[in-house]
């Protein structure tokens, strides 16, 4: 495997340049579809059946590829996203380039490099005959960076049809893979009071800002140690004139949840918040909810990790796993009850920034590692 992978290093760089130099921001569906077509052709060339779906009202391009019957669960699901956070025109400003052992460009790390890893792994497995027995389902969506609103059910359904999931989000510097992620949610609290003259008739007013301030203090108590909840009020709006008691105030809250208990606690808190005003005759409404459940590893995940770690050791590669506050579609596959390992893409960092990069030396290392893991899974199929 190693020699075959190393012989294709320049091809990988050519492929990476092609992909990075395609604008595929979440709002630019033509670019996302172009990415999907690139992979569709390559997957079909190694015997996969493919389809490009247009999901949701916005017709988000999503690619599915599979090499065995869909009537049985696939041995592995390869999961990734084709969209980036960057707007149309970003590629023209700063196209793909290489400098000092690193590759730069929009989405090079998050996560076009990872998508390409999955392709080159499968091409390697095809060359070595592993795909004769191993069943793989590939699912690439086009709206991950905006919350996977149109594709989450599709991802969940495909995960349920798989025995395990590899998510090709970036591997962190130092070969740090991801087994645990916090869940994410947001809530908007809208308080309606009663306007009045702040000087002449303040007693006739109901101060929405005061009510909101007290609610914010209550929200902050969610952050107690061990609660499994991080609740951060990040936006506040209220009042429009100095001499008027404000009749409306709004706060927005970023929620991160470490475990399923934290998820329940946050949902319960905001569900009953409108029923617990501090001021009389005030009206409170709450919008939002939990968007991504927490990614919490169980013993099946750690068993899968043991295989990855063993194969890394064979390659003299030191790896470890981490927990992170950022979310991915791996949150959904874990919630589906399917063992999931994330961060299977290229080593890199500075995601969502202009100095985003991947480490070139990680290309062959990561492809070889994952190919060996897949081969092991194939040889020990039950």
Describe each model-derived feature in a short phrase.
Residues 1-106, 127, 330:
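Acidic/His- and Gly-rich active-site-bordering loop/insert found
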Residues 77, 135-139, 285:
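A structural signal for isolated positions on well-ordered beta-strands in alpha/beta enzyme cores
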């Amino acid at each position: 495997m190693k020699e075959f992978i190393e012989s294709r290093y320049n091809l990988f760089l050519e492929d990476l340049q092609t992909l990075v130099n395609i604008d595929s921001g979440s709002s630019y569906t033509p670019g996302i579809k172009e990415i999907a077509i690139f992979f569709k052709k390559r997957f079909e060339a190694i015997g996969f059946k493919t389809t490009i779906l247009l999901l949701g009202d916005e017709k988000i391009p999503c690619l599915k590829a599979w090499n065995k019957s869909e009537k049985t669960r696939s041995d592995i699901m390869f999961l990734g996203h084709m969209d980036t956070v960057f707007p149309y025109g970003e590629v023209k400003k700063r196209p793909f380039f290489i400098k000092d052992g690193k590759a730069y460009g929009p989405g090079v790390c998050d996560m076009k490099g990872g998508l390409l890893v999955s392709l080159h792994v499968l091409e390697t497995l095809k060359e070595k005959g592993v795909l004769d027995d191993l069943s793989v389902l590939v699912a690439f969506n086009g709206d991950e960076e905006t919350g996977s609103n149109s594709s989450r059910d599709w991802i969940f359904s495909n995960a349920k049809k798989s025995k395990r999931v590899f998510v090709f989000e970036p591997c962190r510097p130092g070969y740090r893979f991801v087994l645990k992620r916090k869940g994410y949610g947001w809530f908007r609290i809208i308080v309606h009071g009663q306007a009045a003259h702040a000087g002449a008739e303040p007693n006739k007013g109901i101060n929405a800002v005061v009510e909101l301030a007290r609610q914010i203090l209550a929200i902050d108590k969610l952050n107690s140690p061990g609660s499994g909840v991080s609740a951060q009020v990040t936006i506040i709006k209220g009042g429009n004139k100095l001499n008027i008691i404000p009749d409306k105030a709004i706060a927005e809250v970023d929620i991160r949840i470490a475990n399923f208990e934290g998820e329940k606690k946050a949902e319960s808190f905001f569900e009953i918040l409108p029923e617990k005003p501090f001021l009389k005759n005030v009206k409170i409404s709450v919008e939002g909810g939990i968007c991504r459940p927490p990614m919490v590893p169980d013993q099946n995940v750690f068993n899968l990790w043991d295989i990855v770690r063993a194969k890394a050791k064979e390659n003299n590669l030191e790896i470890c796993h981490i927990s992170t506050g950022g979310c991915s579609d791996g949150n959904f596959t874990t919630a589906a009850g399917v063992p999931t390992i994330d961060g299977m893409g290229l080593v890199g960092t500075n995601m969502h920034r202009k100095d985003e990069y991947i480490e070139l030396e990680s290309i062959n290392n990561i492809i070889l590692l994952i190919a060996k893991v897949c081969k092991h899974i194939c040889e020990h199929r039950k």
